[in-house]
Amino acid sequence: MKEIILATSNPGKIKELEQLLAPTLCIPQADLGISDAEETGLSFIENAILKARHASSLANKPALADDSGLVVPSLNGEPGIYSARYAGIKANDENNIQQLLSKMADLSQEQRQAYFFCAIALMQHAKDPTPLIATGVFHGVISVKPSGTNGFGYDPVFYLNEYQCTAAELPAKIKNRISHRAKALNQLRALLPD
């Protein structure tokens, strides 16, 4: 791929995707005046397809969308597909983290297991009947308080036992090798024709 539209306006996702997709030229949809698609799907995969199709149809170019979020099994999968708006539509990362920590306040260490899930959809064109779909999972534990300034979203409370730090304390070089998004993009690369 020489050029691709990124079907997101999330600055954190744009930065990570640009790093992970280099040397492909990544054009954020906002640069073309394309607004976010309405996320009406009931799964990460459905939302990734909706977003990629929306951007591809308006740009008339291939588009890649990522729909990802945090899944906490002890909270019945919350925040899940609502991760970005867990504390409300106008919520920011800090609000969402506080909502999560509040809901988990009385949970034991065993109940704090969590994972990030990423679904990526690549549409060659708006009517692509066979979009490429790839997924990745990144396991961790929800800490009791935020720590670290790297990354975005729930990274400050996503603790990685093997690294003894949160995802927000990891250098970008390491996170971009082990994250859910990195795993999904590696899977996508394997699906691309030579």
Swiss-Prot record:
CDD domains, alphabetized: HAM1
What remark does the entry make about the cofactor?
Binds 1 Mg(2+) ion per subunit.
Documented EC number(s): 3.6.1.66
Gene3D superfamilies given in the database record: 3.90.950.10
Instruction: Kindly state which keywords UniProt assigns to this record, in alphabetical order.
Output: Hydrolase, Magnesium, Metal-binding, Nucleotide metabolism, Nucleotide-binding
Q: Where does substrate bind?
A: T8, S9, N10, P11, G12, K13, S68, F152, G153, Y154, D155, K175, H180, R181
Could you tell me the Gene Ontology terms of the biological process aspect for this record? nucleotide metabolic process; purine nucleoside triphosphate catabolic process
Please give the InterPro entries that the UniProt record associates with this protein: dITP/XTP_pyrophosphatase, ITPase-like_fam, RdgB/HAM1
In terms of superkingdom, the source organism counts as Bacteria
- Which molecular function GO terms apply here? dITP diphosphatase activity; ITP diphosphatase activity; metal ion binding; nucleotide binding; ribonucleoside triphosphate phosphatase activity; XTP diphosphatase activity
- GO CC annotation: what is one? cytosol
Q: What class of enzyme is it?
A: hydrolase
Give the required cofactors. Mg(2+)
Catalysed reactions, as listed in the record: XTP + H2O = XMP + diphosphate + H(+); dITP + H2O = dIMP + diphosphate + H(+); ITP + H2O = IMP + diphosphate + H(+)
Residues of the active site are: D67
Give a Pfam family name.
Ham1p_like
Does the record bear Cytoplasm in its keywords? no
Residues the entry annotates as binding Mg(2+): E38, D67
The annotated subunit structure for this chain is: Homodimer.
Task: Tell me the protein family, please.
Answer: Belongs to the HAM1 NTPase family.
- Protein task: Pyrophosphatase that catalyzes the hydrolysis of nucleoside triphosphates to their monophosphate derivatives, with a high preference for the non-canonical purine nucleotides XTP (xanthosine triphosphate), dITP (deoxyinosine triphosphate) and ITP. Seems to function as a house-cleaning enzyme that removes non-canonical purine nucleotides from the nucleotide pool, thus preventing their incorporation into DNA/RNA and avoiding chromosomal lesions.
Q: What's the protein name?
A: dITP/XTP pyrophosphatase
Native source organism of the sequence: Legionella pneumophila (strain Lens)
